[in-house]
Amino acid sequence: MTDRDTVVGHVHGRFQPFHDGHLAYCEWAAGECDELIVGITNADPGHVAAETADPDRDDPRNNPFRYHERHRMITAALSAADPGVPVRVLPFPINRPELWEHYAPADALHLLRVLEPWHEVKADRLREHGRAVTTIEAERTVSGTGIREAMAAEAGAVDREPPGPGGEAGRSADREGAEWRSSVPSAVVAVLDEIDGVDRVGTLYEE
């Protein structure tokens, strides 16, 4: 770091798409540092790899949005939220430690919210390679998988909920859309609409 008193924080994730839980993660991290780097994992096919602790992370259905699209989502959401510190958005290949120095300063403080065992694996991996890590236990309030499934349902690629015991209809496409949009920053919804994100996800779920 150019200034020994400056703390450069680092968060990372796939952000497929960037949702309210991710925004809360970044806002917490911003309170722990003077500058924040948001690292996008699975930035391109060369950075995608199978992980035993997170076996679905390389599934194409779980990676519908390209790096530059996620960069736009994150930049738009954080610009609107104003976390109070300068923010940079860069790739971060969590499964390729030999490349980390190209994307995150060696003395950055890696900040992780632990929601599942995979997050502990990542924290341990960072520590094993000499990285400073701070973790906080948290509960998942938004599911990226749930958002993608709702987007696929809106596109008609997956079945709606079956009728209830009284014969009432399952969820409509309008309700599916309202539900996932309520879990995503409005600036991100605008990007997703512009890139036809619902259709993209729907196509992947149909393959």
Region annotations inferred by a language model:
Residues 1-207:
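Nucleotidyltransferase catalytic core that binds NTPs
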